[in-house]
C-alpha cells in the first residue's frame, strides 16, 4: 500500500499531468500505476516539451517531414500514438474498476476554442484515431466547448472539460452533460461507459490574487473556491433530477483539480494535493508534485473540512472588490492564449 492507495480509498484518483514516449517505453508510467496513479493528462505544452526534449521522437519527426503532411498532421500522428500507448498501459487499471479509472486525455487544437462544431468534428476524429475505450478528449470550457460537450456526450465519448476557473461555468457544464446523457438515453443507447471530468484550475487563481490580497488570505482563495465548487457539485449531482439519470446508468461528472503544482515557493509543495482530497474527484499532478506527495504528503479527506471558513474567505475577497467570476474569465482567456502559443511553438519544428 502507498499513500496513493490511501487517497484512492478516500474516493480520489491521482493522475499524472505529463506524457512522453520515454515515459511509456521506459516502463516508468507502468511503475507509477503500480504505485497508485490512475490516469494521465496531456496538453500542447506537455507535448511541445516532450518533442523538444525526448530523443525517441527524432527519427519519427525526420520521417514524417519526408511525407506530404501538414505540421498539425505530423503532430497528431505522434500524439495519437503516444496516447494510444499510454491507454494500453492504463487499460488494466481501467478494466479493474469497471471503466471508472485509467483514462488518458488528448486535447483538441487550441484554435478551436470558440468553434463548437469544429471542436466536435476534431474530437470525434481524434477519438476514432486513438481507438481506445479509455481515451478521453480534452475540450476547453468556453461556451463553445460546453456546447461541444453536450454533443460529444450524446455521441458516447468521454470528455475532459478543461480550463475551468468559474463556479458558474462549471454548473453550465454539468447541465450540458445532463442534456447529452438525456439525448443518448432517449435514443436508446448506453451511457454507463461515459466519464466526464471538469478540470478546475487551482494555483493560477492564487497566482493572480496573492499580490492584491492581505496576508491572511494569501494562498487561501484557490482552495476556498475549490471547496465551494465541490459543494455546488454535491448539490447538483445529489438532486432528484440527476438521480433520475443515475438510475439509468449515468455517471456523475467528477471535479478534477488541475494546475496543482505550487508556483509560490513560500507554500508547501503538496498544498494543492493535501488540501483537496475528497470522494468523486481527481487531482492531476506534475511529476515533481507527485514525488513530493508520495514522499511527505498527507492522505486525509480535506475537501469537506473548513467549508464555512472557505465561504467566509470568499466573502471577504468579494468585500475587497474582487469579483472571482470576472477573474475566472480573464484566467481562462490567458490559459487559452498560453495553449495557443504552446501549440504554435510545438508545430514550428514540424514544418
From Swiss-Prot:
Pathway: Carbohydrate degradation; pentose phosphate pathway; D-glyceraldehyde 3-phosphate and beta-D-fructose 6-phosphate from D-ribose 5-phosphate and D-xylulose 5-phosphate (non-oxidative stage): step 2/3
GO cellular component, one term: cytoplasm
Subcellular location: Cytoplasm
Entry's EC annotation: 2.2.1.2
Enzyme class: transferase
CDD domains assigned: Transaldolase_like
Keyword Transferase: yes
Principal location: cytoplasm
Alphabetical list of Gene3D superfamilies matching this protein: Aldolase class I
Active site, UniProt feature: 138
GO biological process, one term: pentose-phosphate shunt
HAMAP family xrefs: Transaldolase_2
Similarity remark: Belongs to the transaldolase family. Type 2 subfamily.
Role noted for this protein: Transaldolase is important for the balance of metabolites in the pentose-phosphate pathway.
Protein name: Transaldolase
Originating gene: tal
